[in-house]
């Protein structure tokens, strides 16, 4: 949690420092499934509103969005991609 907070704050600082030439955002992913112990995956999934861990593709979409011109007016934002885990 501390490292995610540091990355988010760094992105915010860089966004103000490098604007308007460069947009800087960050992504805070939740748990990504990588063949973890089934008991861990089940416990994690029970605590997530979308009832599963992320896949790499779940993270890739937001990365592509932030890298594209579709997000041309977004800077200094930390996009949480955690299936709702953090809303509890």
Where are these regions (language model features)?
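Short, small/polar-rich loop/turn modules that mediate ligand/substrate recognition or access, typified
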Residues: 19-23, 74-76
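Active-site segment of SDR-like NAD(P)-dependent oxidoreductases
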Residues: 14, 85
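C-terminal helical subdomain
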Residues: 8, 26, 45-70, 74, ...
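A glycine/serine/threonine-rich, flexible loop-to-helix segment
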Residues: 26-48, 58, 88
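A short hydrophobic alpha-helix cap/turn motif
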Residues: 16-20, 32, 54, 67
